[in-house]
């Protein structure tokens, strides 16, 4: 199983004067960031500041495109056409790429947010749209995904995939996430989350909510910055992974090219 993982958090998910989570503290722990691109959260000032901080701290920059749903934080399903999904992703990735270029950096990966992130695992049309956008803008980008339609479509197009394990979410028996609308979808016990994460990385297994052992091969662990005690949890997960002999590091460009 993976002995090296990229520790990623969703950042820049505020709007105007409103901020969600302690991004500065999380940036001391994580190795990469999924940065909101203005549709579900984020705005030009927040994107600019977040990219600048990632560059200053050596944290990998990732685009976190979502549905155009500020009110619902991108967590509500939207029935869009394939073209609409593609153009929305192109728009958001283009915006973040411009901020990265301004600060002398580049976007390294793309990780769909929220309900879009769930649907691309099961809807081939949405998966194709994301891969089409990414492969035309920069085929050297990684796509972060769970096993499913998006991962399959990316591999078929020659785009490198980072398989994501989500530390604080419950899984169904088929390996998909339990919808947030259902009880128990989000796990809050820090000890349980840390234990599940270490097992996921070192043994390649995560237990579903029904106790089914699901095989996984993650090289990326996602932490949500909008949960209570997110910073303390991130520190604990990193410490326990390192105690288990896991190297915490973002992939380099050479790493990505070697997997192509």
Regions found by a protein language model. Give the residues of each.
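Conserved, mostly hydrophobic/aromatic
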Residues: 10, 64, 110, 223
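Glycine-rich tight-turn/loop motif centered on a GG-T
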Residues: 19, 23, 33-40, 71-86, ...
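Acidic (Asp/Glu)-rich catalytic clusters
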Residues: 24-28, 49-62, 101-104
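Glycine-enriched alpha-helix->loop->beta-strand junction motifs that scaffold or abut catalytic
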Residues: 29-32, 55, 136, 140, ...
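Glycine/small-residue-rich loop that forms an oxyanion/phosphate-binding "nest" at active or ligand-binding sites
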Residues: 69-112
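Charged helix-capping and loop-helix junction motifs
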Residues: 123-129
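Active-site rim beta-loop-alpha module in soluble metabolic enzymes
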Residues: 148-205
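C-terminal alpha-helical cap/extension of soluble enzyme domains
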Residues: 180-260
């Amino acid at each position: 199983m993976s002995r090296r993982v990229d520790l990623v958090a969703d950042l820049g998910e505020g709007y105007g004067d409103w901020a969600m989570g302690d991004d500065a503290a999380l940036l001391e722990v994580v190795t990469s960031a999924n940065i909101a691109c203005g549709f579900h959260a984020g705005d030009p000032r927040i994107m600019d500041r977040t990219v600048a901080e990632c560059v200053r701290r050596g944290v990998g920059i990732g685009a976190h495109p979502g549905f155009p749903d500020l009110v619902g934080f991108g967590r509500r399903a939207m029935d869009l056409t394939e073209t609409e999904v593609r153009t929305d992703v192109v728009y958001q990735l283009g915006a973040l790429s411009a901020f990265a270029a301004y600060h002398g950096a580049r976007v390294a990966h793309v990780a769909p947010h929220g309900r879009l992130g769930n649907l691309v695992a099961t809807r081939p049309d949405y998966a194709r749209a994301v891969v089409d956008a990414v492969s035309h803008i920069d085929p050297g980008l990684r796509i972060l995904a769970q096993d499913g339609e998006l991962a399959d479509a990316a591999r078929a197009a020659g785009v490198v995939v980072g398989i994501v394990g989500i530390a604080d979410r419950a899984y169904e028996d088929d390996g998909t996430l339990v919808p947030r609308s259902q009880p128990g979808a989000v796990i809050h016990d820090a000890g349980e989350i840390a234990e599940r994460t270490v097992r996921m990385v070192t043994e390649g297994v995560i237990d579903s909510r029904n106790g089914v052992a699901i095989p996984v091969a993650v090289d990326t662990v996602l932490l949500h910055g909008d949960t209570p005690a997110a910073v303390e949890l991130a520190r604990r997960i990193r410490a326990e992974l390192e105690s288990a002999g896991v190297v915490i590091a973002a992939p380099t460009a050479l790493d990505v090219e070697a997997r192509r």
